[in-house]
Regions:
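Phosphate-group recognition and catalysis centered on beta-loop-alpha active-site segments
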Residues: 1-168
Length: 168
């Protein structure tokens, strides 16, 4: 009961008209991946776009707060590196290859440029701590001037509160 009240106060649902575009079509969770196509990779996003599916992608913060498209908090599963992505500088993450030759970990700006409004994109901000401001600001800046349909979500209610208090 108290948790739901806090969620409602910190992260109220958006007006239905603002998110209506999210309904009525399939979404590829982390892009359309599998059988030689790695999740949250440019190839997974291109496969989803080809089928007209919207895209859900995950965003993590580098040490400096910049937004990278990567699901896991740790690098181990999808790269040959170990440890948390949040402990690395953007310049270092730019050099990390995804496993099996799937390119580098993309920055959110690169993914938005690739999608280029061809399908809607749902950006999930992943944050395990209370310091969400730098990552939220990075996402907002990446979305400035983006011509396509996009929405931001998070399971951390502080993210929704940040966007409510700091503009859309």
């Amino acid at each position: 009961m108290i948790t739901r009240l806090l969620d409602h106060l910190l992260a109220p649902a958006p007006a239905p008209g603002r998110v209506a575009f999210l309904k009525g079509q399939p979404y590829a969770h982390r892009g359309l991946h599998g059988k030689g196509v790695l999740e949250n990779s440019p190839a997974a996003f291109e496969a989803a776009i080809k089928l007209g599916h919207g895209i859900e992608c995950d965003v993590q913060a580098a040490e400096d707060g910049r937004a990278f498209v990567f699901h896991d908090y740790e690098l181990d599963r999808l790269t040959d590196r170990t440890g948390p992505i949040a402990k690395l500088r953007s310049e270092d993450i730019d050099q990390i290859a995804l496993r099996d030759g799937h390119g580098k970990i993309p920055r959110l700006r690169e993914t938005l440029a690739q999608v280029a409004g061809r399908v809607p994109i749902l950006i999930e901000i992943k944050s395990r701590n209370r310091r969400v401001g730098p990552l939220c600001l990075s996402v907002r800046r990446a979305l400035e001037g983006y011509g396509g349909k996009a929405a931001v979500m998070s399971f951390n209610p502080l993210v929704s509160a940040w966007f409510r208090n700091n503009g859309e």
